[in-house]
Amino acid sequence: MVTPDTAILIVQATPWSASTAGPVTAEVVSVTIQNEKDLDQYKGKLGGKIVLYGPMREVPPIDKGLFGRYTEKELDDIAQFPISPNAGVSPETQARINAYRERQKIIDKVAAFFAEENVAAVIEPSRDARNGGGSGGTLFDDNGATLGRTPYIAEKRVRVPVVVAAIESYGRLFRLIQAHVPVTVQLDVETRVTGEHEHGFDTIAEIPGTDPTLKDQVVMVGGHLDSWIAGTGATDNGAGTVVAMHA
């Protein structure tokens, strides 16, 4: 942030984002786009600006650890818990899922609109998580942060620089805009797409059991390993896969 005060913002380019032509300094504006008709009010007003796209996230207090190990009793309780179609989905989580689905219906048109308006860049908020898991500088920068549903396809590639910001950084910008305080930010986004297609691989393994009474039974366990630019290694489901293998 350059004005009204100088500050370092925690941001990172989203997958398949375009690059800026070196450092870009521009005025920051926010938009509220719920449907395609909302685009009309911004025509001719966004050129050369850095656009905040997305709601401000709440930063809840964190009063306990984000991770913990289940006790034997808790594991027994989970094993006996009746499984329902909505198991584990809280009303808050379902509301976020519904909002995300609605946003995805117009996301390609929004991306094309920003490109046509020649915006300098787009800043999106990192998605939040339960119990403050998306705060403290944590960035969720995977396919869910991408401005578009299929930007990995060449003709659908994002044509403007897009970054995802930590919710604290995004919230500061958002509140200043709401208070009608002019904000200027400098961004320098440098990205590179390594090829039109990267291969994925499947790994299949058989682990024989040791209980002769169960020798005719087969247990299938599956998982996926994704590497995303915001982290190192199998940041998506790596831990879950190891737990499944251990079990």
List each model region and its residues.
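Protein/peptide-recognition domains central to ubiquitin and immune signaling
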Residues: 1-15, 101, 111, 119-150, ...
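Soluble metallo-hydrolase cores and metallopeptidase-like ectodomains found primarily
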Residues: 16-40, 147-233
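Loop/turn elements at helix/coil->beta-strand transitions in domains of secreted/extracellular proteins
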Residues: 46-51, 117-121, 183, 215-219
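Extracytoplasmic/secreted cell-surface and envelope-processing proteins
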Residues: 38-39, 59-64, 130-139, 229-231
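Active-site alpha-helical elements of protease catalytic centers
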Residues: 234-247
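Noncatalytic luminal/extracellular "stalk/propeptide" segments of secretory-pathway proteins
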Residues: 1-88, 148
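Second-shell loop/turn segments in exported
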Residues: 15, 26-32, 41, 63-82, ...
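Surface-exposed loop and adjacent secondary-structure segments within mature catalytic domains
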Residues: 65-80, 124-166, 178, 196-198
